[in-house]
Amino acid sequence: MPQEIVFCKGGGCTAKLGPDLLSHVLAKLPRGEKDSNLLIGYDSCDDAAVYKISDDTAVVQTLDFFPPMVDDPYTFGQIAAANALSDIYAMGGTVKTALNIVCFPEKMDLNILGKIMQGGADKVIEAGGTLAGGHSIADSDVKYGLSVMGTVHPEHIYSNNTGQPSDVLILTKKLGVGLVCNANRVGEAPLGAIEDAVSSMTTLNKAASEISHAFDIHACTDVTGFSFLGHLSEMLNDDITALIDSISIPVITGALRCADEFFLTAAAQRNRNHVGDKVCFAKNIPFSMEEVLFDPQTSGGLLFAVKASEADAFLHELKAAGLPAAKVGRFVKRRDVPIYVN
């Protein structure tokens, strides 16, 4: 009989603290003396920290861990690792090293932990990185993830809020994994839904990031726990508004049905509360699509703002690599509402 791990109430990126609460806490942290080599820190909404160490090299640092959202230990390890590695790719970087972060009950079968860590190690190897160590503590619930270090040229960093009017928005993965995993937790996921979700969550964003280096990318982020609309809102600046074409959004098999059947998450509601007043939905947008756009993603895709004249060629290369990428909208000059969904 296969060994399984127990689902947690908030597995994957649904376990994140809400953005409002997090912003409140971070605002109170002391800044200390400004270091000119810290190119990106926690005072921005970017996906990782970036520290310049020479004229042609900067270190990219990130970490991510969470409870399980699937019952197979090896698959959970793969997903958790792919999710942690993604932040390096979102910054335009290359993965170098990773450290395990482990919380594990002392009375649980250690073979389960071994499978989780094997799944994570295999993804680090696939990313071209080296698993260099880690840290573990005894805990009441299973949690796993990675601290990851990568490198990027200081002049080629992808920031998330440097998009320009007329940029085309390209998303590299489907949305809706939170809805599907929530339905699967109670055995109600539609046929083929969890398989599609797992396939998406275990796919590295490495290929998408590497392909992007040949194009004029103005901004990038990865879509994770704060949802498509939450992370899109972090890409906005004073000069731009986002116009989203909901029909073009790639969606996980069965996710819209899961929304219609109210397999919703508290994290999605937090996302709606946080960013909902920045979004204008057209009257014909169904509730299920709204929920997909507010749905917390685990190991979600990259969202690129690319120069309009290069968008078609970029999308062609992404699709040629087997990615379910799509043009999902564009930036225009600032309007009354930050985000319009049509």
UniProtKB/Swiss-Prot annotation:
It is an enzyme of class 2 (transferase). This is Selenide, water dikinase. ATP binds at K16, S44, C45, D46, D64, D87, G134, H135, S136. Binds 1 Mg(2+) ion per monomer. Disulfide bonds: none annotated. The record marks K16 as: Important for catalytic activity. SUPFAM superfamilies: PurM C-terminal domain-like, PurM N-terminal domain-like. The active site is at C13. Gene3D superfamilies: PurM-like C-terminal domain, PurM-like, N-terminal domain.
